């Protein structure tokens, strides 16, 4: 057995339980398992039994969940799915059914219950929107859209902050059968046009300014340039957000109108009534975009039915979410977690929409909201938890948090030390759910599960209906060893197609070129055969393979970033003309610390001890900055391109594109 394999095996044997479910609590997962057992005549003793049945008999699983979820529809399906087709065939799901996504999100009739809590940086007031008020607003938006000629299949877009109006505009578009897409105000002009110019929207919603990190950021100049680059736009709706209407000049923006005038255009003598177009399950709902860090963003079309049923599965079964829950996911409208979060309305839960920095005026801003509103589920990026730990924040000592039962984390792998931090310094009884999937499926392959334990450093389990495995280079499943994350059977949440990809070649290249007929997601992971948990090891396009040893960059990060002297790090491969590979580790030093040979030696020793000698980088260098996407993900592939002397054309997806130039013409890299 190799040293690497032995280390992985030892790690598996050292599983540490951080949280266990209450055996007396009856969850929706338990009720669903019992319902399936009765309906199908099965003895399903635990989650593992249910999971394996759900992927083995995936057609029956989705049919049973359709019933359990209470999806609102006007016509029942004729067929769940054609099981003779594989995932690469992109089979049609629930053929013959008719439904509407927005109708399902607005189905709960407790009119006076709060649907949306709206909180903003720098404002004390929390605005409440009830379900009845939300329905009324969606009706107004939809009537105005219809008045201007928006119809099924038209694209409606938002260049918006995380706000009630973003939710209302999206639901209105969905009620008509228009396709919604959105980016957040932190995207630059090029980043927005790289996305929206591909889908030719008819209508755009935006704002005049936003507040972030204690500063007001004007938005009109960017919006004007975006509008100029979208010739098919018929209407630009400006929502006064920071300033009152009378202080905003939109005269330079063609076809522009203020929100109140736009909404008034759709009203007659009586308030408009909500109408929900009844559409096929596969009707397009969202166009989502890939990061665009190495080329033009891919435009992924997600269906209304597939998105709805997948999100309901994750919220109801895996999250045990009910109408008594209040969910805050810290996200922008440019990240798929916003779409995922909004779908929670279909459970009757309330949403908290927070717009602003999670660290201003203090790093406690989200914890303050938890106590003030009574939030039960808090979602964030793994990076935020690391930042809190670095700042030695201890909410367990400063906040009540008595309503909080779940913390969710995604965006990047959650470090093992973050598990310890959460249970020691935040709340010992909380379910810490690391979840992982992607924009490509607008959901999760794996994630939180209220019916099984949480183990340190592991995502709890593969999600129901998701036939996920880790494969080696030969296309064989590996257990307890590192491999490519694949999905072997059809899922309703895969994109129906890519926009502007008539022959499907881009789609096939994106997911099915590595293993024909099997979805390769682009992530590197390890599945623990003892617990069923998963450890994410980073993007497989950033996989390191020096001297034939394959490993993920996050394995290095987990060791390096435990050093107080290191604020951040980036681990990338470099190739010479002969195709040989060496690993280069860049360190961004923490404030007050300098890059020293002694630190380099201690890091090398720690990697050698924690992993193996073959994991030790060939070079460890200092850097002043590390590039991130606007969604907070490290950008390894683009740095690899710059190191190789290539140009990265599409910089609009980066939060700090200037840092890419730090990796060009580095003297220490020239002799390889």
UniProtKB/Swiss-Prot annotation:
One Gene Ontology cellular component annotation held by this UniProt entry: cytosol
Listed SUPFAM superfamilies: Acetyl-CoA synthetase-like
Record keywords: ATP-binding, Cytoplasm, Fatty acid metabolism, Ligase, Lipid metabolism, Nucleotide-binding
GO molecular function: acetoacetate-CoA ligase activity; ATP binding
Subcellular location: Cytoplasm, Cytosol
NCBIfam families the UniProt entry points to: ac_ac_CoA_syn, PRK03584.1
Job description of the protein: Converts acetoacetate to acetoacetyl-CoA in the cytosol. Ketone body-utilizing enzyme, responsible for the synthesis of cholesterol and fatty acids.
Family statement: Belongs to the ATP-dependent AMP-binding enzyme family.
Protein name (database record): Acetoacetyl-CoA synthetase
Gene name of the encoded protein: Aacs
């Amino acid at each position: 057995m190799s040293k690497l394999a032995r280390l992985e095996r030892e790690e598996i044997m050292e599983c540490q339980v951080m949280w266990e479910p209450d055996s007396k609590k009856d969850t929706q997962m338990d009720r669903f398992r019992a319902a399936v057992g009765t309906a199908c005549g099965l003895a399903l003793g635990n989650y593992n039994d249910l999971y394996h049945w759900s992927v083995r008999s995936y057609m029956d699983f989705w049919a049973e969940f359709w019933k359990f979820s209470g999806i609102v529809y006007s016509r029942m399906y004729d067929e769940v799915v054609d099981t003779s087709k594989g995932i690469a065939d992109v089979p049609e799901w629930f053929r013959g059914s008719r439904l509407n996504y927005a109708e399902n999100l607005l189905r709960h009739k407790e009119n006076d219950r709060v649907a949306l809590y709206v909180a903003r940086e720098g404002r004390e007031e929390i605005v409440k929107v009830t379900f009845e008020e939300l329905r009324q607003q969606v009706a107004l938006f939809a009537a105005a859209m219809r008045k201007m000629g928006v119809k099924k299949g038209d694209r409606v877009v938002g260049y918006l902050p995380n706000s009630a109006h973003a939710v209302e505009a999206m639901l209105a578009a969905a009620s008509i059968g228009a396709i919604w897409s959105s980016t957040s105000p932190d995207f630059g002009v090029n980043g927005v046009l790289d996305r929206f110019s591909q889908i030719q929207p008819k209508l755009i919603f935006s704002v005049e300014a936003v507040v972030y990190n204690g500063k007001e950021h004007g938005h009109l100049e960017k919006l004007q340039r975006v509008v100029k680059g979208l010739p098919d736009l018929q209407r630009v709706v400006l929502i006064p957000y920071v300033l009152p209407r009378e202080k905003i000049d939109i005269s330079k923006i063609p076809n522009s109108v203020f929100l109140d005038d736009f909404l008034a255009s759709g009203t007659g003598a009586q308030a408009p009534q909500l109408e929900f177009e009844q559409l096929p399950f596969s009707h397009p709902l969202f166009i989502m975009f890939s990061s665009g860090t190495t080329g033009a963003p891919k435009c992924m079309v997600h269906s209304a039915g597939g998105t709805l049923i997948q999100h309901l599965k994750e919220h109801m079964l895996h999250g045990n979410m009910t109408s008594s829950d209040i969910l805050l996911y810290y996200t922008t409208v440019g990240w798929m977690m916003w779409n995922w979060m909004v779908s929670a309305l279909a459970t009757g839960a309330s949403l908290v929409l927070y717009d602003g920095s999670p660290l201003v005026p203090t790093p406690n801003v989200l914890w303050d909201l938890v106590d003030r509103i009574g939030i039960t589920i808090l979602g964030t990026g793994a990076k935020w938890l690391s930042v809190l730990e670095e700042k030695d924040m201890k909410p367990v000592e400063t906040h009540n948090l008595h309503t909080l039962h779940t913390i969710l984390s995604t965006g990047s792998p959650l470090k093992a030390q973050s598990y310890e931090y959460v249970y020691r310094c935040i709340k010992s009884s909380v379910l810490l759910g690391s979840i992982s999937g992607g924009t490509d499926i607008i959901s999760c392959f794996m994630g939180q599960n209220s019916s099984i334990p949480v183990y340190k450093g592991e995502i709890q389990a593969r999600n129901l209906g998701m036939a996920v495995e880790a494969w080696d280079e030969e296309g064989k499943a590996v257990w307890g060893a590192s491999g490519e994350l694949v999905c072997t059977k059809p899922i309703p949440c895969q994109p129906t197609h890519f926009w502007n990809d008539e022959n499907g070649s881009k789609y096939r290249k994106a997911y099915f070129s590595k293993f024909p007929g099997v979805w390769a997601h682009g992530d590197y992971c390890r599945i623990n055969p003892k617990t069923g948990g998963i450890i994410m090891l980073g993007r497989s396009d950033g996989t390191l393979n020096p001297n034939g040893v394959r490993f993920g960059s996050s394995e290095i990060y987990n060791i390096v970033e435990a050093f107080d002297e290191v604020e951040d790090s980036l681990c990338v491969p470099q190739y010479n003309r002969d195709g040989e590979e060496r690993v280069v580790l860049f360190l961004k030093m923490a404030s007050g610390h300098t890059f020293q040979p002694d630190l380099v030696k201690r890091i090398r020793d720690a990697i050698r001890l924690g992993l193996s000698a073959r994991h030790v980088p060939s070079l460890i260098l200092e850097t002043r900055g590390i590039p991130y996407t606007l969604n907070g993900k490290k950008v390894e592939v683009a740095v690899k391109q710059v190191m190789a002397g290539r140009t990265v054309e599409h910089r609009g997806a980066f939060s700090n594109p200037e840092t890419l130039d730090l990796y060009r013409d580095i003297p220490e890299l020239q002799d390889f």
